[in-house]
Amino acid sequence: MISPLAYIHPEAKIGENVEIGPFVFIDKNVVIGDNNVIMPNVNILYGSRIGNGNRIFPGAVIGAIPQDLKFKGEETTAEVGDNNTIRENVTINRGTAAKGKTVVGNNNLLMENVHVAHDAIVGNGCIIGNSTK
């Protein structure tokens, strides 16, 4: 189900059986796989790639531009694999250099207020505790 209060850019690609809550913002150049739950007030921004079976809790921001003064608008991505739990207010920034990427693998738990910085790679099966930066 997609809430009528969500905004999904017409160029975004959304998979099958995706739940999208109210006040979610999904930007252009975003790909979201199947069987995801995206709860209210989540922002999935330009260049984000979300796999299958993820749960994204309220206030998460995925794909914001990197907090790096070297960034000049290059095409970069934030990539989230499959079966992750991304809790409240988690931020995952895009990569910095051209074709750079920030990656969160599969089967991870990112607890509340975690920040995954530009160009970071989180492997598979990780648990990252509250407010880790």
Predicted features along the sequence, with ranges:
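Structural signal for interior beta-strand "rungs" in well-ordered beta-sheet cores
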Residues: 2-133
